[in-house]
C-alpha cells in the first residue's frame, strides 16, 4: 500500500494540526515519502510543537484558515453552493474559518487530492462538509465506509462501521457492492459475507429477513460478485465451521468482505478486533464521494493515521 502511494505521490490535507498524533504521523508520512502534506492551523504553534516532539515538518505546507488568502474565495464558492439554503456571505466566511470546511474546499478545488480528519473532530464534523461540498458520485445513492483490517494472516474489509446507523436492505446491498469494489481496488479478492445472527435458513426475524433481502439484491445488481448470506461471522471466516453450517458456499469460510447488519454491530466489532486481536484498522475509508475524504477514529493511533493517509493518497490517484 505504501509503495502504491509513493508511486504517484499526492498531496493530502490534515486539518487537525493541533493534535500531537497528527504531527507525529505527518512526520512519518513525509519521511517515508507516502504523500505531500498540507497541515491546517497556526503555523508558529504547529512548527514550535513539532520541534518539541522532534518531528521534522520542513517539507509540509502549513496554512491557517483564519488568515489565508483563499478564505474569501472559498466563502464565495460555498455561498453559491448553499444559497438556496439561506446562506449569507458573512456566515460563509465564518464557516470557512473552520478547518474541516476549509480542508474540504482545498479538496474540492483540486489544491490537494484528499483529506484525512477525525482525530479530534467527530465523524459528523468531518463528513458533513464533504456531503455539502464534494457530494456523491452520480451512480451512488448511499455513502458508506469500510475498514481494512490487517490481521496477522490476512486482510479483511469490514463495512459499514462508521456512517449508516441502521441501513435498509437496499442500503445494505449498496454497502456490500461498494465495499467489494473498494476491497478490489486495494488488492483484496472480494468474497462478500452478509452477516447476521443466523446462517442460511437456521433463523428467522426482521433482522435476518433484512440481510436475506439485501443478499438477493446484491446478486441481482452484481451477478458476478461472490456473495452469501445471511451468515454468522464464524461461518464466514472459519472453513471448519463453514463446512458444518454452510457446505458448498463459495464464500463461507473464505470471506474477505464482511458486511455488518447495522452500525452498532460493525463499529464495536472492528474496535474489538483492533484492540483484542492486535489488528491494524485502516479507515474508515469512505465510499461514494466524488473525491476522497476519510474519517479517523478519535482513538486513532499514530500508525492508523499514517495508513489512512496512504489509503487516501491511493484513492486520489484514481481521480
Language model: regions and residue ranges:
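Anion-binding alpha/beta catalytic cores of soluble intermediary-metabolism enzymes, centered on
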Residues: 1-252, 257-319
